[in-house]
Amino acid sequence: MSRKQLALFEPVLLVQALTDAVKKLSPRAQWRNPVMFVVWAGSVLTTLLTLAMVTGQIAGSALFTGIISLWLWFTVLFANFAEALAEGRSKAQANSLKGVKKTAFARRLRAPRHDAQADNVPAAELRKGDIVLVKAGDIIPCDGEVIEGGASVDESAITGESAPVIRESGGDFASVTGGTRILSDWLVIACSVNPGETFLDRMIAMVEGAQRRKTPNEIALTILLIALTIVFLLATATLWPFSAWGGNAVSVTVLVALLVCLIPTTIGGLLSAIGVAGMSRMLGANVIATSGRAVEAAGDVDVLLLDKTGTITLGNRQASDFIPARGVDERTLADAAQLASLADETPEGRSIVILAKQRFNLRERDVQSLHATFVPFTAQSRMSGINIDNRMIRKGSVDAIRRHVESNGGHFPADVEQNVENVARLGATPLVVVEGARVLGVIALKDIVKGGIKERFAQLRKMGIKTVMITGDNRLTAAAIAAEAGVDDFLAEATPEAKLALIRQYQAEGRLVAMTGDGTNDAPALAQADVAVAMNSGTQAAKEAGNMVDLDSNPTKLIEVVHIGKQMLMTRGSLTTFSIANDVAKYFAIIPAAFAATYPQLNALNVMGLHSPNSAILSAVIFNALIIIFLIPLALKGVSYKPLSASAMLRRNLWIYGLGGLVVPFIGIKVIDVLLTLLGLA
């Protein structure tokens, strides 16, 4: 569930952005953007020239120079406004997070148990390693791990999701976030961070942009823009002696106007806004990125590692069939499977009980009256079951049951081996049931592949992105599900070490890898991946290892993260193409206006039929400023994203933004020229 989206132009944000745009007119603020600093310097110079002309210190048209100066200042202001508006949207999102932070007191325990003596201390004084007791109705005062107890927790202030979640000691659901509220019961929490380092603090800092640094692609593009600016600066500087030698020197005002129109001011003015807006869009998807670098890396990803359960399949495997061993009837198998599952609260365990009831009317037994000993599932044993009336019933993975049978002096039947293989080939997960050393048969657990997922993978394949399914299932089951889902490859019987090795293998081939994870055992792979989306419901170790956190804890979100990253890169590339293509029309407007008096042959370049040299220069400068305002919505929302191959995407952008960058200025400059003529300003 995503939090409330801000309108693109909220009135409150517009007013604040206008104020911030004026504040950014200082030289120190402008120096951060070399392209716009040149425009700022040109604005200052033409302002001084206007004042000198008004006071009669130098000759020239004060009106013409003044209008040029005014629109150069507008160009700087519009660029500042774009950046301030993007930052304002992020700050508004940060302010909503700040509302979660409350000054509160915490019960700091003197020993790590719920009945230990407690001291009431301000939450801000809690340090890493402190133990606190939190009861129903309390705000959790710090990020940490639950070491005792279990409780229902309202995380809506962080995630936007109204449904409460369970947090309890042990397992992958022990991580809690400061600022969330306990609805019932109590928790003993070990604080895992110091003041100012909480997840909420980091979220606020990231969203506000306090930690925003330019990404590698942004730096590379900035260097390109600086290089183009230097080239045009040198070219413009040589035009004055060139025109003076011809007997009619071009004025400094015209040269400044020419320089500003030729340098890539459009992308220069919007570049910062695009980066800030990319992180803001990521937050709109309920994903917190640690930096713009992470968002950018998401756009460059070409390998996705996707967990099968919850991402590719619905994640609620259901018992679909009982397949007895030779000499065993199906009812006997169903009865044993149901007994072994009575204390199994997993969806799979409950589905086995229900299937036995539906098939053979085997009613669920009263657990208390059985006087049985239940054997829980563990990662080591990989099986669970029940000991009742001298009967020892177990269900589990094929390998685990085989070891169990052989250790009890039995043998694993060949017909059951064949049944296991048949179930796996159909994409189901086989569980084997055994009583003592006698194998009774196989339970087929069927997981459903999500609707539409195959089409999404086909779109990713068009974009050159390889999809790899990660699963703990055996190779046959994994191969069947992979074929049904349409992924490019799979890793079966996955372990943390195998995932880490796979990521390193792809990276050694020069690929960028993205993955999701929520457990402590995922932390090494998350730390190695280029884009690592940790689930908010996961452990502290997983969240610290990732460079993004999904507040919705939805593994499928990884695909959306890649889309947002690619959209940011496409927006930057498209507007750069548009900005550079713009120069052609401005060239046809200003060059004839500036030099036709010296070289009449250049009038042939006035293909737009502009009214006069002054109107041509004014029209180009005004268009140069206004186009920034018109492109702000595109910079903030991002260009329309379509899953295409790199070559198809390049062709599309060249047609839309390259050709558009050529045509739009011709039309815009001509329209402005006509208006200036009608107003008598030409």
UniProtKB/Swiss-Prot annotation:
UniProt GO MF annotations: ATP binding; ATP hydrolysis activity; magnesium ion binding; P-type potassium transmembrane transporter activity
Keywords: ATP-binding, Cell inner membrane, Cell membrane, Ion transport, Magnesium, Membrane, Metal-binding, Nucleotide-binding, Phosphoprotein, Potassium, Potassium transport, Translocase, Transmembrane, Transmembrane helix, Transport
Compartments where found: Cell inner membrane
Pfam families listed in its UniProt record: E1-E2_ATPase, Hydrolase
Residues of the active site: D307
EC number: 7.2.2.6
Sites where the protein binds ATP: D344, E348, F377, T378, A379, Q380, S381, R382, M383, S384, K395
Listed GO CC annotations: plasma membrane
Protein family membership: Belongs to the cation transport ATPase (P-type) (TC 3.A.3) family. Type IA subfamily.
Subunit and interaction comment: The system is composed of three essential subunits: KdpA, KdpB and KdpC.
UniProt xrefs under HAMAP family: KdpB
Cited function: Part of the high-affinity ATP-driven potassium transport (or Kdp) system, which catalyzes the hydrolysis of ATP coupled with the electrogenic transport of potassium into the cytoplasm. This subunit is responsible for energy coupling to the transport system and for the release of the potassium ions to the cytoplasm.
Name of this chain's protein: Potassium-transporting ATPase ATP-binding subunit
Gene: kdpB
